[in-house]
Amino acid sequence: MISANRPIINLDLDLLRTFVAVADLNTFAAAAAAVCRTQSAVSQQMQRLEQLVGKELFARHGRNKLLTEHGIQLLGYARKILRFNDEACSSLMFSNLQGVLTIGASDESADTILPFLLNRVSSVYPKLALDVRVKRNAYMAEMLESQEVDLMVTTHRPSAFKALNLRTSPTHWYCAAEYILQKGEPIPLVLLDDPSPFRDMVLATLNKADIPWRLAYVASTLPAVRAAVKAGLGVTARPVEMMSPDLRVLSGVDGLPPLPDTEYLLCYDPSSNNELAQVIYQAMESYHNPWQYSPMSAPEGDDSLLIERDIE
């Protein structure tokens, strides 16, 4: 039975912010740089946090530090506490921000990361009107450069703009659930037509691995690619978000090489002098990112934390 007179612990936001930084960056040294403190100060902060909650948050395993069960439990709450704190501050500071924010989104991001971004922006800046324009990835940079959009969400990192990683997802080979890939024959590919960064990546990956391929179906839209793959016309490569019950993942066992991860990026053109876009971009930059797909892992032998990222 829980006593009604049990004292309530008030968690220190500075301690929680450092705790999350350590978890995200994997080492005390990296976290110290992120929160502008010395490594010894970070260590002392974590000791104070353990004393405050009355639980061990870290356990040593050889050279590695691991979050304990209590540490993992606290990490989820710490993220939420900091998120609500930062959101409250941003909302009060920019509650009167008005205007029309035009966001360009690539096909890949329109039904994946974009809804989360729109929810975040509209909740913090309720007086903003949002105008969303969805086009192929290859045309996004041109739209931002011509100021047709204020910000863009894309999976292709442009060199000319500032880019904030919203999410990193695994990229897989896909075919229909009942599809049988014929070994020894060129890979039948289902791809978008040019220009397409994904198409370029797929062909470069196969060529580098000396794997023969052929174009089985070329589409002008991403829904058409999905439909063709589900119909059993061939194989494609897309981020993990494309996975559905009527598709299956192909791998090295099927003779296909690994693919690079897909980054979902929020991009801003600093040369545009667009104050509204700058405010939103900087707010997202300082906002802890809850949308990462893959768990964090520590390099072998590193003095780091092995944790699962809290995904909401």
Curated annotation (Swiss-Prot):
Keywords: DNA-binding, Transcription, Transcription regulation. The keyword Transcription applies. Residues 28-47 bind DNA. GO terms for molecular function: cis-regulatory region sequence-specific DNA binding; DNA-binding transcription factor activity; sequence-specific DNA binding. Residues 11-68 form the HTH lysR-type domain. Pfam families: HTH_1 (PF00126), LysR_substrate (PF03466). GO terms for biological process: DNA-templated transcription; negative regulation of DNA-templated transcription; positive regulation of DNA-templated transcription; regulation of DNA-templated transcription. Not known, does not seem to act on the proton translocating NADH dehydrogenase genes (nuoA-N) which are part of the lrhA operon. PANTHER family: HTH-TYPE TRANSCRIPTIONAL REGULATOR LRHA-RELATED, TRANSCRIPTIONAL REGULATOR. Belongs to the LysR transcriptional regulatory family. This is Probable HTH-type transcriptional regulator LrhA. The lineage of its organism: Bacteria, Pseudomonadati, Pseudomonadota, Gammaproteobacteria, Enterobacterales.
